[in-house]
Amino acid sequence: MTFNKKINEIITLLSDLNILELNSLINEIRNQFQIPDIVSTIQTGNKTKPEANIIEQKESAEIKKSNFELILQTVPTEKRVAVLKAIRNTTSLDLKGAKDSIADLPKKLLDNLSLEEAEKAKTLLEEAGATVILA
């Protein structure tokens, strides 16, 4: 099957994402294009094999992973102040520590987080303008 250049680039980028990042991407695509969540619209007895596998893989990944790391990928120059404030609000770092944490990216900012804590911290940092991944 041949794809155009843009599609090949997208597939290459997608292959580097972890399961949580893919899940976030799917949710954003659903919201952007107003696509209903197929998992919630499928009745348990009516699952097709591929749909059942996707659901089982998602549940399995959620069960296996209980501790997460928050990795700060990028901080746009114009968003530095907002990101520094968000870092100080999500960590115990002082201003110097927060500045040091954005000096050499990517950098692990937090570790041993529950999924809920990790998602909350990720949301705060992304709202401030940072690019963050959970691992």
UniProtKB/Swiss-Prot annotation:
* Function, in words: Forms part of the ribosomal stalk which helps the ribosome interact with GTP-bound translation factors. Is thus essential for accurate translation.
Where found?
Plastid
What Gene Ontology molecular function terms does this protein carry? mRNA binding; structural constituent of ribosome
Q: How does it assemble?
A: Homodimer. Part of the ribosomal stalk of the 50S ribosomal subunit. Forms a multimeric L10(L12)X complex, where L10 forms an elongated spine to which 2 to 4 L12 dimers bind in a sequential fashion. Binds GTP-bound translation factors.
Superkingdom assignment? Eukaryota
What HAMAP family does the annotation carry?
Ribosomal_bL12 (MF_00368)
Whose protein is this, by species? Helicosporidium sp. subsp. Simulium jonesii (Green alga)
Alphabetic keyword roster: Plastid, Ribonucleoprotein, Ribosomal protein
Instruction: Check the record and name the InterPro entries matching this protein.
Output: Ribosomal_bL12, Ribosomal_bL12_C, Ribosomal_bL12_C/ClpS-like, Ribosomal_bL12_oligo_N_sf
What Gene3D superfamilies does the annotation carry? 3.30.1390.10
Q: Name one Pfam family in it.
A: Ribosomal_L12
Q: What is this protein called?
A: Large ribosomal subunit protein bL12c
Principal location listed in the UniProt entry: plastid
Q: Could you give a single Gene Ontology term from the biological process aspect?
A: translation
* Recorded GO CC terms: plastid; ribonucleoprotein complex; ribosome
Which family is it part of?
A: Belongs to the bacterial ribosomal protein bL12 family.
